[in-house]
């Protein structure tokens, strides 16, 4: 008799995705982040659900409701900080997952990659709206600054901003709709992640060598289930350490001050995971130019398959490209640092140079390095 997991319509899908899935025998721990992102998403949806049971999306009571969750709800402080720091872990995994894709040429799976880029945008939108909900100073002013960027769009900009606000400023209508969107988007992200996996399983996983692994496949379970569980344990260990020892390490103290439209904080800045994009935005002394650079800083990922000039898929055997890749990583860390600094000398010029370098490496230097490496192969 055939095993039920191979015949039952529902269990067959799970079996073909997580149990009998043929996987390359040589994928490293850099391939763990897909499953870790799944764990992060489930964690965020669950903690978010319990937070939504006690949260009120009204400007008068939002801040108080978050205080109530932390003080009066059973383990409310734990749920709240797991959710806030879970977002940070989510983005750490996202950045490492995307970096892995860039390094090993995973972007050659075009459908999988493009859905991944859409997922990144959706996650960033969700995180931004979530940051507005506690209705602290940085929530309010962050929402004001970022939504205001849309006014840079010619002709329709101002109308668009007022339409999103639901009035002439960030107010009750804005908070209510942001809560609604923040609730629904993670489920859209989950659906997109399913499509992401669907397209990935059409081709099979890439591997560090960038070569076809069709001749050497192993079942996903038990090999990679066990390997993924180790990753999950490390993730949970880091997250619980963060939540229990320094829950406010990555937050902004200004967000413990209730939102006040009459008082602007000295330094308006987003959460740490947006600082690199924020630094690029601020580097251009023109509103529309800055917004375009901000969008392109992420959208540029969609153009990577077109910029791939190498004869090899992975960077494993391409030392010049490797060098440029790690310079790009250092550049992104520099941009993250600059994004959190005030707009004054020398930070302005450092940010501008780092922004130029970011686009130059991806658009010019990496394709050129690949061509050089192709020619070196002929020697």
From Swiss-Prot:
Highest taxon listed in the record's lineage: Eukaryota
Keywords: Electron transport, Heme, Iron, Membrane, Metal-binding, Mitochondrion, Mitochondrion inner membrane, Respiratory chain, Transmembrane, Transmembrane helix, Transport, Ubiquinone
Effect of residue 60 to T: In strain: Isolate SNP-2
Subcellular locations according to the entry: Mitochondrion inner membrane
Membrane topology: Multi-pass membrane protein
Required co-factors: heme b
Residues given in the record as heme b b566 binding sites: 97, 196
Keyword Transport: yes
Residues at which a ubiquinone binds: 201
Subunit annotation: The cytochrome bc1 complex contains 11 subunits: 3 respiratory subunits (MT-CYB, CYC1 and UQCRFS1), 2 core proteins (UQCRC1 and UQCRC2) and 6 low-molecular weight proteins (UQCRH/QCR6, UQCRB/QCR7, UQCRQ/QCR8, UQCR10/QCR9, UQCR11/QCR10 and a cleavage product of UQCRFS1). This cytochrome bc1 complex then forms a dimer.
Family per record: Belongs to the cytochrome b family.
This protein's name: Cytochrome b
